[in-house]
């Protein structure tokens, strides 16, 4: 483990456990802050070292203080805006499920330092029209408007209103879409916002979702360390039914992956999971840490998209990497990739060729995006692709 990674992990561990972080050599502060920035934890890093002024250069303290206060103020304001929006949903009689960042932030010692790009909530499919009308009436501008996630923006506020939470299968080992179609069977009254129509996932189901969500991000591009920090605080927060969780992980074919995640959470943050764990080879854990930290919050930092696209092809087989097949997949996606956007495919899959034309005719940005992806795929480092595919297998995915 290099020095920057070790110091960075010590700061996150200090945030989790209330301990002291490692000292930072003067010449390494810039690299440390950049690592925290790409992983969306700069406010946490600032908070930790401000609490230990003996470890922080005097000239750097105003910078850290400003970063910490700005982040806390912004996310406090966004939290207040979400509470107001939730009250509007409640007044309209629309049931909604809170999950991910807006719930998880409350498990952090300083909730306002848990960053998030958008706020997610789930509604019933039959409430889609009513929720869309409500969002527009409140001044939110629609962004993406196809199933199962509809996004809206107003200033710095950004919301995703879901009718489902799993639109793709993480792998071919289980039917993840079907499993997570039963989300309403695993809800309880919200402890975050105590409103009659506000719900949350039960803790056990929420943990299963978080693990699957991480696996999904890894299968696409990557998952930064903030997602594992969420798991650490989740484990500290709840007494869980681990027998039920273990059985469901088997159903989801995620037992091996969860084992790696729980080993990482213990190694990185000092938070243990009650489930019995199997040892993971040190070289796999080292590669996993490098992959997690270097790629940033969603795995794209310092990693071109062509590499990511090629990695997704035949993920379980390291030797199968074809630029041509990947290009064809992006030009002519299968039905499962388009049926949520062009819903006529759900009942008329034979209209797939029409959807290909429809997609490219939607806007000039589709052509520009495809041209950019083509350049990236043709120039991608194939050795890096094979390395990522090997790691994917070693993680149990």
Residue ranges and their predicted role:
Residues 1-117, 123-397:
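Conserved NTP-donor binding/palm subdomain of two-metal-ion nucleotidyltransferases/polymerases, i.e.
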């Amino acid at each position: 483990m290099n020095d920057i990674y070790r110091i960075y992990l010590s700061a996150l561990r200090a945030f989790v456990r209330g301990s002291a972080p490692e000292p930072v050599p003067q010449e390494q502060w810039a690299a440390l802050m950049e690592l925290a920035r790409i992983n969306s934890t700069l406010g946490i890093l600032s908070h930790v070292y401000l609490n230990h002024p003996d470890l922080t250069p005097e000239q750097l303290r105003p910078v850290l203080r400003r970063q910490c206060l700005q982040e806390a103020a912004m996310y406090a304001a966004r939290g207040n805006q979400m509470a107001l929006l939730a009250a509007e949903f409640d007044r309209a009689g629309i049931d909604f499920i809170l999950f991910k960042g807006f719930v998880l932030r409350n498990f952090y010692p300083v909730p306002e330092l848990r960053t998030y790009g958008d706020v997610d909530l789930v509604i019933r499919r039959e409430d889609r029209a009513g929720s869309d009308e409500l969002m527009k009436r409140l001044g939110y501008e629609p962004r993406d408007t196809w199933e199962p996630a509809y996004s809206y923006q107003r200033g710095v506020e950004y919301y995703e209103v879901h009718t489902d939470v799993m639109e793709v299968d993480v792998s071919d080992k289980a039917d993840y879409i079907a499993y997570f179609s039963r989300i309403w069977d695993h809800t309880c009254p919200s402890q975050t916002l105590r409103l009659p129509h506000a719900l949350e996932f039960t803790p056990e189901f929420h943990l299963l979702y978080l693990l699957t969500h991480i696996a999904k991000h890894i299968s696409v591009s990557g998952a930064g360390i903030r997602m594992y920090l969420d798991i650490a605080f989740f484990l500290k927060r709840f007494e869980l039914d681990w027998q039920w969780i273990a059985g469901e992980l088997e159903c989801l074919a995620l037992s091996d992956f969860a084992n790696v995640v729980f080993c990482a959470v213990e190694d990185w943050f000092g938070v243990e999971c009650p489930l019995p764990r199997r040892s993971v080879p040190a070289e796999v854990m080292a590669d996993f840490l490098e992959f997690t930290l270097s790629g940033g919050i969603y795995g794209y930092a310092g990693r071109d998209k062509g590499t990511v696209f090629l990695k997704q092809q035949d993920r379980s087989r390291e030797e199968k990497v074809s630029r041509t097949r990947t290009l064809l997949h992006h030009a002519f996606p299968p039905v499962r990739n388009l049926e949520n956007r062009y819903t006529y495919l759900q009942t008329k899959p034979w209209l797939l060729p029409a959807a290909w034309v429809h997609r490219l005719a939607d806007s000039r940005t589709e052509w520009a995006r495809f041209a950019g992806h083509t350049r990236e795929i043709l120039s991608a480092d194939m050795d890096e692709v094979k390395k990522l595919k090997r790691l994917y297998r070693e993680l149990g995915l």
